């Protein structure tokens, strides 16, 4: 084995030289230069500095403006809540451990950080699945006269938390475990060892199939069908200017959604899966550190993509920030009135987010 396994940790370095120490008790500067740990702390500070206000503002604006309290926005609010879970439960812990060079909070703190980071990430992931299904049902209309109402939204929110807990909870009760990873300053599921005492192998397989592969398939299917439906609608309307514009907007939004998902999660999942199927392989701490920390950036990507691209929400946010006045409202209202007739056929199909 090219790593050193302890009771509740796995350091990706052989202990032949005798320098490896528990990441709960000693700084891990033998894994990297001190400035590298400082860089991680600075990165986490950036995510907190951006993710906290954007997600909090999302909640505040939606509560303040009644017209935003639509069923679809329940899912978007839930997405913001999940991002805040990652910020408060994961990022704040990681910034402190990175500044100290090791996981100073011990195994209990590792469970805390790993649980909330995983929970927030999984709620966010399953929110994307619910959004994809909602778009598919509304735009592609596989069920005639389907309307996405408050009851559907509440069911969707509950579903995201049930699925997230079914992924983040088991390591706390003996099915797999949370251990420090990469430079040993953040915690995640143990992909590094089989650990038969906690049936680690079966949990990792379950996690990859149920909590990564299936969501990815659902998202690709739903948005793939959505793009096809929009193109068919455009062809039937002789590709009018408004329809072409709507098609471009929806296509751009879908591409950004899918690409953001892939950028955030595929590198982390791919590296984790590689390590899992190549137990004991030789890899540097950065091999897991970079994708693990990059996946955390989803807490910033999510509100930017799913909230800030929502025109209605954007107008309400500007109004809130500008203390009740929107300096762009007059210009936008003039533009909207000019295209109201053309856009009615598109909005009736609910092609764009509510």
UniProtKB/Swiss-Prot annotation:
A lipid is attached at residue 322 (S-palmitoyl cysteine). The chain crosses the membrane at residues 37-61, 74-96, 111-133, 153-173, 203-224, 253-274, 287-308. GO terms for molecular function: 11-cis retinal binding; G protein-coupled photoreceptor activity. Photoreceptor required for image-forming vision at low light intensity. While most salt water fish species use retinal as chromophore, most freshwater fish use 3-dehydroretinal, or a mixture of retinal and 3-dehydroretinal. Light-induced isomerization of 11-cis to all-trans retinal triggers a conformational change that activates signaling via G-proteins. Subsequent receptor phosphorylation mediates displacement of the bound G-protein alpha subunit by arrestin and terminates signaling. A motif ('Ionic lock' involved in activated form stabilization) lies at residues 134-136. The modification N6-(retinylidene)lysine is found at residue 296. Residues 333-354 are annotated as: Disordered. GO terms for cellular component: membrane; photoreceptor disc membrane; plasma membrane. Belongs to the G-protein coupled receptor 1 family. Opsin subfamily. This is Rhodopsin. Residues 334-354 have a biased composition (Low complexity). One of its GO terms (biological process) is visual perception. PANTHER family: OPSIN. It is found in: Membrane; Cell projection, Cilium, Photoreceptor outer segment. It comes from Leucoraja erinaceus.
């Amino acid at each position: 084995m090219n790593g050193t396994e302890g009771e509740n940790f796995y350091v990706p370095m052989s202990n032949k030289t005798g320098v490896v120490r528990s990441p709960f008790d000693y700084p891990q500067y033998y894994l990297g230069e001190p400035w590298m740990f400082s860089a991680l702390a600075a990165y986490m500070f950036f995510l907190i500095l951006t993710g906290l206000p954007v997600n909090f503002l999302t909640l505040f604006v939606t509560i303040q403006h009644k017209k935003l309290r639509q069923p679809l926005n329940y899912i978007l609010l839930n997405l913001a809540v999940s991002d805040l879970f990652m910020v408060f439960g994961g990022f704040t812990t990681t910034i402190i451990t990175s500044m100290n060079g090791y996981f100073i909070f011990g195994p209990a703190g590792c469970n805390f950080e790993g649980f909330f980071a995983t929970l927030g990430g999984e709620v966010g992931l399953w929110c994307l699945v619910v959004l994809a299904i909602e778009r598919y049902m509304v735009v592609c209309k596989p069920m005639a006269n389907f309307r996405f109402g408050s009851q559907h939204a509440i069911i969707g929110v509950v579903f995201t938390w049930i699925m997230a807990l079914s992924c983040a909870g088991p390591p706390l009760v003996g099915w797999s475990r949370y251990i420090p990873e990469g430079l040993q300053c953040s915690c995640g599921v143990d992909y590094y060892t089989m650990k038969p005492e906690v049936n680690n192998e079966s949990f990792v397989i379950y996690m990859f199939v149920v909590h990564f592969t299936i969501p990815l398939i659902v998202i690709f299917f739903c948005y793939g069908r959505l793009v096809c439906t929009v193109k068919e609608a455009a062809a039937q309307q002789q590709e009018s200017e408004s329809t072409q514009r709507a098609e471009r907007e929806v296509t751009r939004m879908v591409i950004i959604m899918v690409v953001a998902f892939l950028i955030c999660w595929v590198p982390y999942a791919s590296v984790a899966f590689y390590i899992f199927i190549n137990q004991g392989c030789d890899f540097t701490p950065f091999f897991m550190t970079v994708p693990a920390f990059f996946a955390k950036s989803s807490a910033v990507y999510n509100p930017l993509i799913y909230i800030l691209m929502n025109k209605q929400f954007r107008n309400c946010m500007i109004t809130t920030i500008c203390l009740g006045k929107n300096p762009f409202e007059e210009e936008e209202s003039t533009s909207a009135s000019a295209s109201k007739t053309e856009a009615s056929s598109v909005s009736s199909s609910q092609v764009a987010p509510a």
